[in-house]
Amino acid sequence: MNKLLFTIPMVFFLSLASGQAQTKKASSTTTPKSVSVAQGEVARWAGNCLRCSFEKRAWSAVNGTCYYPVDMDMKPGHYTISRRTTGGKLETATINVAEKACVQEDITNFPKKEYVNVSPQNQARAAKEAAVVNPLIRYQSSLRPAVFDLPVGKPANSLPKGEGNFGACRTINGQPRDRHTGQDYPVGVGTPVLSVGNGRVLLAANQFYSGNAVYIDHGNGLISEYFHLKSYSVKPNQTVTKGQKIGFAGETGRVTGPHLHFGVRWHGACINPGFLLIDPADMQEVK
C-alpha cells in the first residue's frame, strides 16, 4: 500500500518534468519569416539592414531597410530573400509572389498609322534603341550609392490619379503588343515634368516608341523613366536634383493623346512606380 502511494507521485513528477521540457523546446522555436506580394510590387524588411539579396542578386540597404522589387513578369511562387544586419547577423525569409491579373487594353482606330504596321526601317530603329537602353536598366552588381529617399517626389506638380494601366496587356487594332511598363498620368501638353529624386541622367533622346524620353539613375539600382515628352531640357551625365524640371509633357511616340508615362526599374525589375510614391511603411513588410 505504501509502495503504491509512493509510485504515483513519482510518475506525476516525471510527467510534469517532461511537459516542461517540451514547452521550453517549443518556445525556443521561432516561426519562419515571410511576406506576400503580387507581381510588380515591392516588399520591405526594416531594421538595421546593411545588405539585401533576392534570387542571386544583392544590393545595399536604403537607410537601414531592405527593399525587394518584384518584376511584373516574375513567375508566381515562393522565393528566398535574405538580409545582413549591422550586427553581422544573416537572416532569411520567404517572399510569396502572387499573380497580378493583366488589365486588357484594346486600342482601336489608332491615329498614328506608322505604329500599326511598323516598317522594316522603324523596326530596325527600335531594335537599335533597345540595344542602348537595355544595358542601362538591367540589374548590375556594381552600383552607385543611393541618392534618393522614399517616398520619391512626384513626376509632376498636382499629379492626377494614374490611369491604373501598369502592366496592361495591349492590342492595337487587334494586333498584340508588349505589356505596358509604366503608369500613365493624364497631364496636358506643356506640363512641367520633374525628376522624382536626386540622380544622374543616363539618357535623353528621341525614340521611336517612347518619343522624347529621359532616363535617370538615382543610385542603388533605381532608374526612373519619363516618356512621350514634348521636349526635354537635360542631357546625359547631367546631375539633377529632386523636383528639378527635366522637360515638358507631350504626345510624342506611340500615344493616342497627351499624357506622362512614368516608369521605374529597380535592380532590373520592372515595378509599378506608384509603390515608390507611397509611405514605405505602407508596403508589405517581412514578419
Where in the sequence are the language-model features?
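Catalytic cores of peptidoglycan-degrading enzymes
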Residues: 155-287
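Sec/Tat signal peptide C-region and signal peptidase I cleavage site
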Residues: 17-21
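Cationic-aromatic interfacial patches
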Residues: 22-103
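Local alpha-helix boundary/kink/capping signal
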Residues: 15, 75, 151-152, 279
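Bacterial N-terminal signal peptides
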Residues: 7-15
